[in-house]
């Protein structure tokens, strides 16, 4: 789960992480009143969408940039009016863009140094890792690819938490000196406390800045939370903005289906994440384009299969479905019954390729063959992928 930047600032304030004040607004008039109440000499107006690259983005109404620094309340109102209820297109949104329903009015600060700082889970080392760089405000992937020596990493023992020397080590590596060291070590320590307390999978600050009046603060932030731990954080769940998410992913979540939408035209329903990724790979290998990742898990019911089919066929780009099931815990006869019922319930209009293997596979194949539905059977994954690709050509 992701949250907006203005919500990230609220969490920073809660955990004592220094950050310029920022308040969300839903109308241009509300934005102007917010700026008036703040009473600053300059403001930054930011479109609130779950996507990076806002500053270089373009609105479909022709307005350039999702981040603007302005010097008056009147300018705040004008810029907010051009952003709100308009679609912002960035390198991360794709051509469809994202509708801006909120903007944030924040304190504009003058900078003399920008750094990159993040905490995330290192799955290989099974512990959190701090990733930092003196080259902030940039695409960190580009920095890592072209100047890997500029990336600083510090692994944290989860049993001990971040130790004072580790926070200081990062601050020194970011080339901070004097009074800035104390501020930076406090900020780094508090961000780690936030990371663990809220079950985050990522807290990214880009940039972490030093202002001209010698303040160390988090200027922009991105949060990801562990969905499996959200039940412990109802206050975080309240921050969820489903309008920013793929509606198919939201719908799939209601039925415990793991779904991620893609841009292809072959819908996939598979049991097991590894098999799902292998299925997507082999579709690509044979010249096709998968439309999604969908893992129904190991205990799919007829209702789950029906809902999965309904979600897959709601994508107008999908021209064929490929079902790839390995029956271990899940029996092939049960999944076959679910496929038949689902195909009848939603009145399937597109080619359906089914590959079954495993427990009760022969019974499952007979159920499909006797169903009267135009199912395209496949005996192995190669054959299934080739038939699915052929069906959309």
UniProtKB/Swiss-Prot annotation:
Substrate binds at residues 271, 328-330. The keyword Ribosomal protein does not apply. Keywords: ATP-binding, Ligase, Magnesium, Metal-binding, Nucleotide-binding, Tricarboxylic acid cycle. Binds 1 Mg(2+) ion per subunit. ATP binds at residues 46, 53-55, 109, 114. Its cofactor is Mg(2+). Mg(2+) binds at residues 206, 220. Gene3D superfamilies: ATP-grasp fold, A domain, ATP-grasp fold, B domain, Succinyl-CoA synthetase domains. InterPro entries: ATP-grasp (IPR011761), ATP-grasp_succ-CoA_synth-type (IPR013650), ATP_grasp_subdomain_1 (IPR013815), Succ-CoA_synthase_bsu_CS (IPR017866), SUCC_ACL_C (IPR005811), Succ_CoA_ligase-like_bsu (IPR005809), Succinyl-CoA_synth-like (IPR016102). Pathway: Carbohydrate metabolism; tricarboxylic acid cycle; succinate from succinyl-CoA (ligase route): step 1/1. Residues 9-251 form the ATP-grasp domain. Its EC number is 6.2.1.5. GO terms for molecular function: ATP binding; magnesium ion binding; succinate-CoA ligase (ADP-forming) activity; succinate-CoA ligase (GDP-forming) activity. It comes from the Bacteria. GO terms for biological process: succinyl-CoA metabolic process; tricarboxylic acid cycle. GO terms for cellular component: succinate-CoA ligase complex. Pfam families: ATP-grasp_2, Ligase_CoA. It catalyses: succinate + ATP + CoA = succinyl-CoA + ADP + phosphate; GTP + succinate + CoA = succinyl-CoA + GDP + phosphate. PANTHER family: SUCCINATE--COA LIGASE [GDP-FORMING] SUBUNIT BETA, MITOCHONDRIAL, SUCCINYL-COA SYNTHETASE BETA CHAIN. Heterotetramer of two alpha and two beta subunits. Succinyl-CoA synthetase functions in the citric acid cycle (TCA), coupling the hydrolysis of succinyl-CoA to the synthesis of either ATP or GTP and thus represents the only step of substrate-level phosphorylation in the TCA. The beta subunit provides nucleotide specificity of the enzyme and binds the substrate succinate, while the binding sites for coenzyme A and phosphate are found in the alpha subunit. NCBIfam families: PRK00696.1, sucCoAbeta. Belongs to the succinate/malate CoA ligase beta subunit family. HAMAP family: Succ_CoA_beta. This is Succinate--CoA ligase [ADP-forming] subunit beta.
């Amino acid at each position: 789960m992701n949250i907006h930047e203005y919500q990230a600032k609220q969490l920073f304030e809660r955990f004592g992480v220094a950050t310029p004040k920022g308040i969300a607004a839903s109308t241009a008039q509300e934005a102007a009143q917010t700026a008036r109440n703040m009473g600053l000499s300059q403001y930054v107006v930011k479109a609130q969408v779950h996507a990076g690259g806002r500053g270089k983005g373009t609105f479909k109404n022709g307005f350039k940039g999702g981040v603007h620094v302005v010097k008056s309340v009147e300018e705040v109102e004008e810029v907010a009016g051009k952003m709100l209820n308009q679609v912002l297109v960035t390198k991360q949104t794709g051509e469809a863009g994202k509708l801006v329903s909120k903007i944030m009015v924040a304190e504009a600060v003058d900078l003399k140094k920008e750094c990159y700082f993040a905490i995330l889970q290192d799955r290989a080392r099974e512990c959190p890792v701090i990733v930092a760089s003196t080259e902030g405000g940039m695409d960190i992937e580009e920095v890592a690819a072209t100047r890997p020596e500029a990336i600083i990493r510090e692994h944290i023992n989860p049993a001990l938490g971040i130790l004072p020397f580790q926070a200081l080590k990062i601050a020194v590596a970011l080339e901070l000196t004097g009074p800035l060291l104390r501020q930076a070590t406090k900020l780094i320590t508090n961000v780690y406390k936030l990371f663990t307390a809220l079950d985050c999978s990522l807290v990214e600050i880009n940039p972490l800045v030093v202002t001209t009046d010698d303040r160390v603060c988090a200027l922009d932030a991105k949060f990801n939370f562990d969905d499996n731990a959200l039940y412990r954080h109802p206050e975080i769940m309240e921050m969820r903005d489903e309008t920013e998410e793929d509606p198919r992913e939201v719908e799939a979540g209601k039925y415990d289906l793991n779904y991620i939408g893609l841009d292809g035209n072959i819908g996939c329903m598979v049991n097991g994440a590894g098999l799902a990724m292998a299925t997507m790979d082999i579709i690509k290998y044979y010249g096709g384009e998968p439309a999604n990742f969908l893992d129904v898990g190991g205990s799919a019911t007829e209702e789950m299969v029906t809902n999965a089919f309904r979600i897959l066929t709601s994508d107008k780009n999908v021209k064929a479905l490929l079902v790839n099931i390995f029956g271990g815990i899940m029996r092939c006869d049960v999944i076959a019954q679910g496929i038949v019922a689902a195909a009848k319930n939603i009145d399937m209009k597109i080619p359906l390729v089914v590959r079954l293997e495993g427990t009760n596979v022969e019974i499952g194949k007979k159920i499909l063959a006797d169903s009267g539905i135009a199912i395209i059977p496949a005996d192995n994954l190669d054959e299934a992928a080739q038939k699915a690709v052929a069906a959309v050509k």
